[in-house]
Amino acid sequence: QGSGSACRSLWGGFVEWRLGDDDDGTDSHGVPLAEADHWDVAMVVAVVHDGPKPVGSTEGMERSRLTSPYYERWVETAAADVDAARQAIASRDLQQLGEVMEASTFKMHATMHTSRPPLLYWHPGTVALLHEVQAIRADGMGAWSTMDAGPQVKVLCSANDARSVAERLRPHAVRVDVLRPGGPAALESP
């Protein structure tokens, strides 16, 4: 079983992961929103831990669904967050996309933190990186954090700011990578 979000990797550029109608999510799918050259943005990925997660994403989300008092509210707000993100991508509004993305990330982690037993994927480096992203913003540079169910912090910023953001994050991470929107999935021969 793979990640449902992998459907976003089939197309290049900006892709929305849409729910399907099936309760088990097997008919979820990716829908292209814009080509890779639509917007000159970057995602700076700060890796703080290379090992496996203590609880896998599927098991963790099921635990959150069943036990977190915040899970339903997170789900209820997801459609509005996706709409705002879609609009931000269409209009190339980095601040709007960053704000909605970061808020959604913290809502998701709130559901995990309030699960029983709690799911705490964060490491000390994770918290240091989240503080550093806020400091970068306070210094006037557009940078917003996002995370999946794990300890790594990804930072959305303009492509022009990516190198500076990466340098600010480097002291708190074991590795920092700068990624840009790419093309569609392709098979390559060895």
Regions found by a protein language model. Name each.
Residues 33-190:
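C-terminal nucleotide
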Residues 1-40:
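Gly/Ser-rich oxyanion-binding loop with an adjacent helix/lid
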